[in-house]
Amino acid sequence: MVIKMSLTNKVPEKDVHDLFTRVAPHYDQMNNLISLGTQNGWRKKFFKKLKVKAGDFALDLCCGTGDLTIALAKQVGPSGNVIGLDFNQKMLDLADKKIRGQNLQKEIQLKQGDAMHLPYTDQSFDIVTIGFGLRNVPDADQVLKEIYRVLKPDGKVGILETSQPTNPIIKLGWESYFKLFPNFAKLLGANVDDYKYLSHTTAKFISATRLKEMLEQDGFKNVIITKLNLGAGAIHIGIKKKMR
């Protein structure tokens, strides 16, 4: 069965860009709320599953304020290199401040760009990651195809994203939580409507199983899923196998 996920996010791309410019100062707090305060633990599990090697050349898509990018740079070490790509300059400015604060300017390069149309040649990277970004792009399938294109043979993709719990009781609690989520905007001094959008894309994103099927459809092999917080989040790891 073909899993089509074009127009994942039907909000016009310019509107999404403007929204992230507005929420940038509160983005880290927002991610903490979305992950129920466990995003740091999620990242640790993510890298444990991804098994990055020292010296890898890595690309972090939708890098936002740079937390995953910085963690990735520490994994590849000084012999490796990381590019963090995001479509929003305000987010990149915040990422740059963090990177300079940790003296990682040599290891990390930031780039403003479109995850659906990557400005890189085929088979460029050992690792491509995307954290909390796939649900916000207009066409997630196109992003997965681009990831596959720029990965080297035997390269790995790692996706850290919110998901949908399958247990009915947990699912009900998850949905109830996100109905309250926009109210947190007031505590952060942010726009309530922006947080309604963020809660909607989080609550309505596809299941971990469907995302696995999409990855396999686009050519990735040995795709594994690790569920987080009883299914509220998920890690997907896949490999671009060498042609035999």
Swiss-Prot record:
Pfam families: Ubie_methyltran
Enzyme class: transferase
Taxonomy, superkingdom: Bacteria
Catalytic activity: a 2-demethylmenaquinol + S-adenosyl-L-methionine = a menaquinol + S-adenosyl-L-homocysteine + H(+)
Pathway(s) where this gene product acts: Quinol/quinone metabolism; menaquinone biosynthesis; menaquinol from 1,4-dihydroxy-2-naphthoate: step 2/2
EC number: 2.1.1.163
TM region(s), chain numbering: none
MF (Gene Ontology): demethylmenaquinone methyltransferase activity
Residues reported in the UniProt entry to bind S-adenosyl-L-methionine: T65, D86, D114, A115
GO BP annotation list: menaquinone biosynthetic process; methylation
Keyword annotations from UniProtKB, A to Z: Menaquinone biosynthesis, Methyltransferase, S-adenosyl-L-methionine, Transferase
NCBIfam families: MenG_MenH_UbiE, PRK00216.1-4, PRK00216.1-5
Family recorded in the similarity comment: Belongs to the class I-like SAM-binding methyltransferase superfamily. MenG/UbiE family.
Biological role: Methyltransferase required for the conversion of demethylmenaquinol (DMKH2) to menaquinol (MKH2).
Descriptive protein name: Demethylmenaquinone methyltransferase
Species for this entry: Lactobacillus johnsonii (strain CNCM I-12250 / La1 / NCC 533)
Gene that encodes the chain: menG
